[in-house]
Structure formats: structure tokens, C-alpha cells
Regions:
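Metalloprotease/metallohydrolase-associated module, dominated by Zn2+-dependent proteases
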Residues: 2, 67-103, 115-177
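Metzincin-family zinc-dependent endopeptidase catalytic domain
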Residues: 1-108, 112
Length: 177
């Protein structure tokens, strides 16, 4: 999760840093608070209940107020898990954890796109498009297209790149990174 988010944001010219929200100090850059709701583990096929694939459900949301997009992101792990389960349920636990962690990182990057661009608009392709399939999230490469990168900040990655600090109160028992 952390590595995927860092890789996606680096392409947009940002550096990410993860902090405990109870212990953070002032930051030079943007502070974003994330909340991971639900069970962020993908079950093995033998442990499956009656999970129904989700369609039209938001797997990630960013708070808004008065037309502004606020630095508060929510990832619905239950919806994301249901989306990924058919694709990875027979894989070993480490592979399922990796797929979920990478997918959470991609959803977080998508939501950060909205905050950093201060736009609810979506390009037609890439990581900022409006809808993801489980297959999109499982792709080896699923990145921002050029229009999304331009909207966020067209600055090249340099040592003094703006920092995005992510504080999470969500807990992931599997230790995804």
C-alpha cells in the first residue's frame, strides 16, 4: 500500500511520508488523513461467505465542503475486497495481501488526485478515471494518464518535491505495505 502510493505520487512530483495521526507535528506540504473501513484482507476460497460482486459502489471517497475537496480520504475495504476476491481467492495469502495492498495504494492515489487537483472531474483513462474494475486494479501497470498528472502538478520530481504526509487511523492486521 505505502510503496504503491509512493510510486504513483512520485510520478506526479510528490513525496509521501506516513505518520501516526496522534504524533504528527507541523509538516511542510499537504497533510491528508485516511480511514480504512472494514476488513482489508481478501479471504481464501474456503473461507468465502456469500460475497456479492459490487457495481457502482464507491471504493474510495474524498470529503468535500463548500465546493472544496478536503484532505480526508476513506477507503471502503469491504467493497474493494469484494471486487478483488474473484480474481485472487485461490492465491496464497501473501499474494492476496499484496494485491489488496497495491489496490488500496491505487485507490488512495486516485483520491489524492481529487484533493491535489481540487477537481471532481475524471479523465477517460488511467488511475484517475471514474470507475475501476478488479482487473484494472490487478494490472501490472495502472498509472495516472498525462492529463491527470498535469492537473495535480506538472513539476518534475526533485529533492525538494512537495511532501504529502498520510496519517491513518485504520488498522490492517496483515501488515500491508
Amino acid at each position: 500500500m505505502e510503496k504503491e502510493l509512493a510510486d504513483q505520487m512520485r510520478a506526479a512530483g510528490f513525496v509521501t511520508d506516513w505518520e501516526d495521526p496522534q504524533r504528527y507535528d507541523a509538516v511542510d506540504g499537504y497533510m491528508v488523513i485516511i480511514d480504512l473501513d472494514g476488513d482489508c484482507r481478501v479471504p481464501f476460497h474456503a473461507d468465502l461467505g456469500s460475497e456479492v460482486p459490487v457495481q457502482g459502489v464507491h471504493i474510495g471517497t474524498t470529503a468535500t465542503a463548500g465546493g472544496d475537496i478536503l484532505p480526508f480520504i476513506n477507503v471502503d475495504c469491504e467493497a474493494l475486497r469484494t471486487l478483488l476476491t474473484p480474481l485472487v481467492t485461490d492465491e496464497p495469502e501473501t499474494s492476496r495481501d499484496y494485491a489488496m495492498g497495491r489496490s488500496i495504494g491505487r485507490v488512495l492515489a486516485h483520491e489524492l488526485y481529487h484533493f491535489l487537483s481540487q477537481s471532481e472531474d475524471h479523465p477517460d483513462s488511467g488511475l484517475a478515471k471514474s470507475r475501476f474494475s478488479g482487473s484494472d486494479l490487478m494490472k501490472y501497470k495502472f498509472e495516472f494518464d498525462q492529463s491527470a498528472l498535469t492537473r495535480m502538478q506538472p513539476a518534475p520530481v526533485v529533492e525538494s518535491a512537495p511532501e504529502v504526509v498520510v496519517a491513518s487511523e485504520g488498522s490492517i492486521e496483515t501488515g500491508l505495505k
